[in-house]
């Protein structure tokens, strides 16, 4: 920019720039972006005089590079679905690279499920959405398997990337080895797909996200080995909001849900986040009303467990307590569990208990 006017656009394309830094000489701009794939993060060197880009991270995957002040040396930390962790040191002037760390496979010697990544269309019929499917290694002919949808769905989070095992969590792997299918999809409103993709949920949180999650459910039901009568959903924070949202708006679909630290009414949420995406309750009264899950507490049919830390300063206790009151008034019966002394998440030794609790709930129902 010069005197408030743009001189020229340096980058252009259907991808997102995640970070940018000019080198000391003023000749180059170093950026990380999703140009190669929405699932990857790579480092590029852009010549400011002509806009020419050079990719500096040759391996596929999610890279977290560190540059020297001179711009000559780089430490490249990365992983991809086949590589648990790699650290390389590169001299960008000579092109020489030395490996500093090649982490061993932490799952070596253990039975592993089948983990795959793919795309389906969003509810708009046009946008590609990326999913991760973690399922038992051997699918028996004629057998039907229960499904757990692990959901977040909100802004600034991307759950499916070309990281180690497609970013599958240890609990996903554990549950798949016990006979569950774990499904995760990044719908519209999630991160690293550009502003239009993320901003489509503005002032109407929970609407578009729900539509795209249900497209994922349609696809799951098309698989011959999925038991459509045993579909559950689990998420935390915005994912807890989405879990409750999905259970209440599609009670015939979801048998069981576990919502951790769930947002219930966005007017109770911190202004910094809530008003960024919803506007104020005064100027967007209808949007807040539509996204308030208390108004449809009477729709609950399946088994829903809400979990909350009693010291949560982010999603304050008022969220889940107000929902319990709404359920009492409407005659529905969720389950509830509190972790004393914990904040927005359950950490430390009690986290083992948390995942045992979640696992038992899905096993029981």
Model-derived regions, located:
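Serine-hydrolase catalytic core recognition
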Residues: 62-365
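Multi-bladed beta-propeller domains
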Residues: 1-19, 23-25, 33-36, 46-63, ...
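Repetitive beta-architecture junctions, highlighting loop-to-beta-strand starts
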Residues: 5, 39-43, 51, 85, ...
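Short beta-strand elements that form the blades of beta-propeller/WD-repeat-like
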Residues: 27-33, 72-77
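Short glycine/acidic-enriched loop and turn motifs that connect beta-strands
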Residues: 35-39, 80-83
């Amino acid at each position: 920019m010069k005197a408030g006017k743009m001189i020229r656009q340096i980058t252009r394309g259907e991808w997102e720039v995640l970070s940018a830094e000019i080198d000391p000489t003023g000749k180059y701009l170093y950026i990380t972006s999703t140009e190669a794939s929405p699932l990857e993060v790579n480092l590029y060197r852009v010549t400011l005089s002509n806009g020419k880009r050079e990719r500096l991270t040759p391996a596929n995957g999610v890279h977290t590079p560190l540059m020297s002040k001179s711009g000559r040396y780089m430490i490249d930390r990365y992983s991809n679905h086949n590589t648990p962790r790699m650290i390389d040191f590169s001299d960008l002037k000579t092109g020489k690279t030395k490996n500093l760390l090649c982490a061993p496979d932490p799952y070596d010697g253990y039975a592993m499920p089948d983990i795959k990544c793919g795309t389906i269309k969003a509810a708009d019929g046009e946008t590609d959405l990326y999913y991760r499917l973690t399922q038992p290694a051997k699918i028996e002919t004629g057998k039907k398997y229960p499904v757990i949808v692990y959901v977040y769905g909100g802004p600034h989070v991307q759950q499916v990337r070309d990281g180690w095992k497609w970013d599958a969590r240890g609990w996903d792997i554990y549950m798949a080895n016990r006979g569950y299918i774990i499904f995760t999809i990044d719908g519209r409103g999630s991160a690293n797909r550009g502003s239009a993709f993320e901003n489509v949920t503005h002032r109407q949180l929970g609407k578009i996200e729900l539509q795209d999650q249900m497209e994922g459910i349609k696809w799951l039901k098309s698989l011959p080995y999925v038991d459509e009568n045993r579909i559950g959903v689990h998420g935390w924070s915005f994912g807890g909001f989405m879990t409750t949202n999905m259970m209440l708006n599609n009670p015939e679909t979801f048998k069981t849900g576990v919502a951790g630290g769930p947002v219930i009414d966005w007017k109770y949420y911190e202004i910094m986040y809530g008003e960024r995406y919803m506007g104020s309750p005064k100027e967007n009264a209808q949007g807040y009303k539509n996204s308030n899950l208390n108004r449809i507490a009477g729709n609950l049919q399946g088994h829903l467990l809400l979990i909350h830390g009693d010291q949560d300063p982010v999603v304050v206790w008022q969220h889940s307590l107000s929902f319990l009151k709404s359920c009492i008034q409407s005659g529905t019966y969720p389950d509830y569990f509190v972790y004393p002394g914990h904040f927005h998440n359950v950490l430390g030794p009690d986290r083992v208990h948390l995942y045992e609790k979640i696992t038992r709930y899905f096993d029981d129902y």
